[in-house]
């Protein structure tokens, strides 16, 4: 039987995309390409999808990551064959570690055109290796392959994603012709096998996993410390409320978007007088993963390791992810649950240890005041990276925050306080794709956005500024330009090679980059100028403004060293 291959390609694409929508996909990200035409045209015709486009597949993948991160829903990505597929790998690797659900719909040449010199054909099978939770390599659409097989195959992949998170890869081999005016209605007999599904609204197959949740052997009379890692603001607030109910210290990572009276722990844990008081704990209760602070990670390791030396210190970890999050391989009780569901199962009683570490609060308040005096309120206060970090709480009211990687996120951990939704890429902690991810976050959330990104990270993802050029929502992109990798001033790299092989100074500024993409540009010279222009744009501005804050290369490291010395002397 002869058939129109282009129409059959469209039927398969429609079937796949309809099923993905029933699995919760609302956003589809598309890069240009001919081989992906069946998927692109079908996505464009489905009214239930929000379509996002970008000319760069690497940026497209990260934009999808941001959409998935903010929406907590799966996001589809459509690209053509060849290196277009390979360019998705960085975003896929990040999603593997942080759990965002991406559905990669990659167009491919049919099998007879792979490995024989055909144009734009590479071996795409297994290209994402262990960075995806499931693979589906589809044959070329054919009337000999029933649509109910296609649906159960897609369902298998999506059920796997529901259980394990991260990206899944569906490789679609489309033969030519790719374009046709033919009608799908001519293939009614082929479509009839899934007619009931087409008229319904449910996925073709359904699976239900019975929850298994043992009783929690919780002892409210332990001296607990609650650590809050990378969580949504809602979940972080639930964890914080639990800690406050127990009367225990709360050490909140910047990624949680919450703060507490116990903030700036990366600084005061370096002070033996203060750290020794917290060492009396016998339960570390951690909600969420990906702790930024090296000192906090070291403190957890030190405390829990003592349980192997006769001291009973327990380490409990609460996360909905099945993934192992235990970088120093401590004895750990992992509750696979959201903070809310876990807290609801705990029988919280009055605790005899309420306020057991409150003696620390006076000293911590002194640390906070010392930060303000040094970097915000002193007549000598200047515009530097630490001042930006210390000021962040005042800039982030009623806006979403995206923190880039490398130096600045660590400065926020040391000197900042937050009380808003915070987004990061702290899985692989790469410096690529950060503008694109932030754009995806804002597209999903629809709120004003304040982003902080380093100069090297900005250069790495410069073409993703195009994603902000057609944006009407107020956005401020703060580029901290210390002329290269100032993070290496904080690390024991060889002095003789630090500049040439680690920091790699570039001498670039960002005014013309902003102009090329039609963005507003400002370069403040004082902290007061910075505060005013950011506040004004986020409250009453429109579109995107890039704010460049230029500082000397080694300034941040020198200021931290001087501050720690001053703090130690004042305690």
Curated annotation (Swiss-Prot):
EC class (word) = transferase
The cofactor required is: Mg(2+); Mn(2+); thiamine diphosphate
Q: Which GO terms describe its biological process?
A: menaquinone biosynthetic process
**Metabolic or biological pathway, per its Swiss-Prot or TrEMBL entry:** Quinol/quinone metabolism; 1,4-dihydroxy-2-naphthoate biosynthesis; 1,4-dihydroxy-2-naphthoate from chorismate: step 2/7; Quinol/quinone metabolism; menaquinone biosynthesis
Q: Cofactor comment in the record? A: Binds 1 thiamine pyrophosphate per subunit.
Question: Which is one Pfam family of this protein?
Answer: TPP_enzyme_M_2
- Disulfide links within the chain: none
Stretch forming the signal peptide = none
Please write the reaction equations for the catalytic activity of this protein. isochorismate + 2-oxoglutarate + H(+) = 5-enolpyruvoyl-6-hydroxy-2-succinyl-cyclohex-3-ene-1-carboxylate + CO2
Q: Which domain of life is it from?
A: Bacteria
Instruction: Cite the InterPro entries for this sequence.
Output: DHS-like_NAD/FAD-binding_dom (IPR029035), MenaQ_synth_MenD (IPR004433), MenD_middle (IPR032264), THDP-binding (IPR029061), Thiamin_PyroP_enz_TPP-bd_dom (IPR012001), TPP_enzyme_TPP-bd (IPR011766)
EC number(s) recorded for this UniProt protein: 2.2.1.9
Classification via NCBIfam families: menD
Q: How does it assemble?
A: Homodimer.
Entry protein name: 2-succinyl-5-enolpyruvyl-6-hydroxy-3-cyclohexene-1-carboxylate synthase
> What organism is the protein native to?
Vibrio parahaemolyticus serotype O3:K6 (strain RIMD 2210633)
Q: What is the lineage of its organism?
A: Bacteria, Pseudomonadati, Pseudomonadota, Gammaproteobacteria, Vibrionales
Corresponding gene? menD
């Amino acid at each position: 039987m002869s058939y129109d291959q282009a129409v059959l390609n469209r039927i398969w694409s429609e079937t796949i995309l309809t099923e993905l929508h029933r699995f919760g996909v609302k956003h589809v990200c598309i890069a240009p390409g001919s081989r992906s035409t069946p998927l692109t045209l079908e996505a464009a015709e489905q009214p239930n999808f929000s379509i996002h486009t970008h000319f760069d597949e690497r940026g497209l993948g990260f934009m999808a990551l941001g959409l998935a991160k903010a929406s907590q829903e799966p996001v589809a990505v459509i690209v053509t064959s060849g290196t277009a597929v390979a360019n998705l790998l960085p975003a896929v690797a990040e999603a593997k570690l942080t759990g965002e659900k991406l559905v990669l719909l990659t167009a491919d040449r049919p099998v007879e055109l792979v490995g024989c010199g055909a144009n734009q054909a590479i071996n795409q099978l297994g290209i994402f290796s262990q960075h995806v939770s499931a693979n589906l390599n589809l044959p070329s659409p054919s009337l000999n392959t029933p649509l109910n097989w296609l649906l159960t195959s897609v369902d298998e992949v999506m059920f796997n994603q529901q259980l394990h998170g991260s990206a899944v890869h569906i490789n679609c081999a489309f033969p030519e012709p790719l374009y046709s005016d033919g009608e799908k209605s001519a293939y009614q007999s082929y479509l009839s096998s899934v007619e009931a599904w087409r008229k319904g609204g449910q996925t073709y197959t359904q699976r239900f996993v019975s929850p298994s949740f043992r009783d929690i052997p919780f002892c409210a009379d332990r001296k607990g410390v609650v650590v809050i890692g990378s969580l949504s603001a809602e979940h972080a607030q639930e964890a914080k409320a639990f800690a406050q109910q127990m009367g225990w210290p709360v050490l909140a990572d910047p990624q949680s978007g919450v703060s507490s009276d116990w903030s700036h722990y990366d600084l005061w844990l370096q002070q033996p007088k203060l750290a020794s008081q917290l060492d009396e704990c016998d339960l570390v209760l951690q909600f969420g993963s990906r702790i930024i602070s090296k000192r906090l990670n070291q403190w957890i390791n030190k405390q829990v390791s003592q349980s192997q030396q006769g001291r009973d210190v327990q380490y409990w970890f609460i996360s909905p992810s099945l993934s192992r999050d235990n970088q120093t391989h401590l004895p750990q009780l992992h509750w696979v649950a959201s903070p809310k569901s876990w807290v609801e199962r705990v029988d919280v009683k009055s605790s005899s240890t309420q306020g057991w570490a409150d003696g620390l609060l006076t000293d911590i308040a002194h640390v906070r005041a010392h930060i303000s005096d040094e970097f915000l309120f002193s007549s000598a206060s200047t515009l530097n990276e630490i001042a930006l970090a210390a000021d962040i709480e005042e800039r982030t009211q009623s806006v979403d925050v995206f923190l880039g990687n490398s130096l600045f996120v660590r400065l926020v951990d040391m000197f900042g306080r937050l009380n808003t939704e915070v987004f990061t890429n702290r899985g692989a902690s790469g410096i690529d794709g950060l503008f694109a991810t932030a754009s995806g976050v804002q597209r999903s959330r629809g709120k004003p956005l304040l982003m902080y990104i380093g100069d090297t990270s900005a250069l790495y993802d410069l073409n993703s500024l195009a994603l902000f050029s057609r944006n009407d929502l107020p956005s401020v992109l703060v580029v901290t330009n210390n002329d290269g990798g100032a993070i290496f001033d904080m690390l024991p790299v060889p002095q003789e090679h630090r500049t040439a092989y680690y920091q790699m100074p570039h001498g670039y500024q960002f005014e013309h980059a902003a102009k090329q993409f039609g963005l507003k540009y400002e370069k403040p010279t004082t902290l007061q100028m910075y505060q005013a222009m950011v506040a004004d744009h986020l409250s009453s501005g429109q579109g995107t403004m890039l704010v460049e804050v230029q500082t000397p290369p080694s300034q941040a490291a020198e200021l931290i060293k001087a501050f720690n010395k001053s703090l130690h002397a004042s305690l």
